[in-house]
Amino acid sequence: VTETTAGDIRRLDPASAAADLRAAADTGRGFLGLDPVTQNDVLLAAELTRMQAQVFRAGDMLLGAVANPDQPRQAFVAATSADPAPLRAFLSFLGTRQRCTSFVAMVPDGAASVAAFERCGFRRVGALRDHRYQSGGYQDVVIYHASREDTCSA
């Protein structure tokens, strides 16, 4: 897709994306609403296909996007790392090639990727209380939003 300081960003097929999400362990939890710790690879690949998700790898980071069915120029995005450089390149790709004008990230509270989203111009706009069950308890999911202009100026 593009070159970043983290190396090439390359698209993964659903089976490879499922395997890489499983290998990401806890940093992959909540990635586009999925849980690679409790879902097997076949189910993950089927869900990624059903959602028409695009999953990419940039170094050790996984990046994902799903078009919002109610707003075709808006993408739900996910990342597994705090590094903003690959995320910024990915958002630029989505804006330029797929004409996305805004982005929404639903991130488990306390996830490492929060730092990347904030450094790329995302703003916290809300939270879903007790939205996700993990490790014997419910956890909040934080909602972030950014327009294309926000991510390009960061």
What is each PLM-predicted segment?
Residues 53, 139-143:
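Short hydrophobic/aromatic beta-strand or adjacent loop that forms the aromatic wall/cage
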Residues 11, 62, 124-128:
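Residue-level detector of beta-propeller blades
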Residues 106, 123-139:
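Conserved catalytic-core motifs of GNAT/GCN5-like acyltransferases
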Residues 96-108:
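Conserved GNAT acetyl-CoA-binding A-motif
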Residues 59-62, 112, 138:
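Glycine-rich acetyl-CoA-binding "A-motif" of GNAT/NAT acetyltransferases
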Residues 29-87, 93-94:
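Acetyl-CoA-dependent GNAT
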Residues 1-50, 150-154:
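A short, well-structured alpha-helix characteristic of acyl/acetyltransferase catalytic modules
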Residues 109-127:
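Conserved active-site alpha-helix within GNAT-family acetyltransferase domains
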